[in-house]
Amino acid sequence: MKNIHKNASLIVLWAALIILSITRGYSIPPKRVIKLGFIPLTDCAPLVIAKEMGFFAKYGVDVQLSKEASWAVVRDKILNGELDGAHCLFSMPFSVYTGIGGKSGSEMKIAMILSNNGQAITLSKDFCGLVGFRDLKKVAAAVKSVRAHKEVTFAMTFPGGTHDIWLRNWLAACGVNSKSVGIITIPPPQMVANMKVDNMEGFCVGEPWNGVAATQGIGFTQISSQDIWKNHPEKALVVNKAFSETDKEDLKNVMKALIEACRWLDVMGNRKKAALLLSKPNYVNAPVQVIEARLMGSTDIGCDLGVQKYKDDYMLFYNNGIVNTPKISYGIWFMAQYMRFGMLNTAPNYNEVAKKLIMSDLFEEVAKSMNVPVQEDMKPFKTNIETIVFDPKNPAAYIAGAKK
């Protein structure tokens, strides 16, 4: 009986405290809103799907998506805390940390990879008839021919970003030194408009903007990024340092929701719906037919060059778990490219920087809880358009032998 009275007294006291807190203007703090940025590109799909299909809500996180104008804006907002994280170029944190794309030493953390493949290099109509689809042998002569009557300029989306590196790798494989042409930075959604007014002769960007250029007759797809390196790392979930260190439970739940979205996206029957959602003005704001076609692996090349069908290396988001592991070796590879192309004068401490910026332990924890196989790392690998093997344990040997 005494215990019953004691429990009743505690309940009354608890209720009184709640009433007192409300009357004094106090309230239970609301759940924190997590703000994630994205650039209007087809591969922002994991964030859009996690939001639209309720995966963020399923894992108990209140996520607000923020459409951003450029990768530079994304960088600044992650670093100053306006964004907790974003759909980001995988190599951006390395570019920023090494001082190529931002203030040296600035830390942006990579939590997981969101996508492979699905980017391309588009050439203007000036190159129509001079070079065909995936024809690398004729590019140098075509550049020389166009250069006879105008300066040849190529655009990418962020210094040291993935598109910058795909462009430089393509130029090198074609026998064109990247220092012999102009390379400028243009935000992804502005690429087509800039080519239309003749601001550049080619660009490297993510979809759907290559597809839009081809369907509008402004340019044609010369090569897709998966032809440069099949199943390459492309976009990642990149977060600010504070979010990665002080709010790990929320971050883990964001990652779980994104993994579920990535799985959903790799069911091909879902891609039509994904394209429809992405095409909305508040997301990518591009023709649904163009988004859908390239999501399904169908590339209308443009310039009367026909259609290329990709069967197993179109844009991938999960691929039985192969996509999502953020490998240390990938970070080392991108930093090796910076040295290869003279973007850095002094070699960084490759392992130290990669391990500092990639949250391998956190990803492994989340992956195991979601039954995602963590991929083996630090093994040598080779891209499609190079003959030289990259050994992440010896980047200097690769740099010495790679075409510049």
Segments from the language model and where they lie:
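Secondary-structure end/capping motifs
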Residues: 246-359
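Soluble non-cytosolic domains of exported or imported proteins
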Residues: 41, 68-72, 87, 158-162, ...
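Short, low-complexity disordered leader/linker segments with a strong preference
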Residues: 1-31, 375-377, 381-388, 392-404
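Short, glycine-/small- and polar/acidic-enriched structural segments
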Residues: 28-184, 197-213, 218-231, 383, ...
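Short glycine- and hydrophobic/aromatic-rich loop-to-beta-strand nucleating segment
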Residues: 121-122, 236-239, 243-244
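Conserved C-terminal helix/tail region of periplasmic/extracytoplasmic solute-binding proteins
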Residues: 332-404
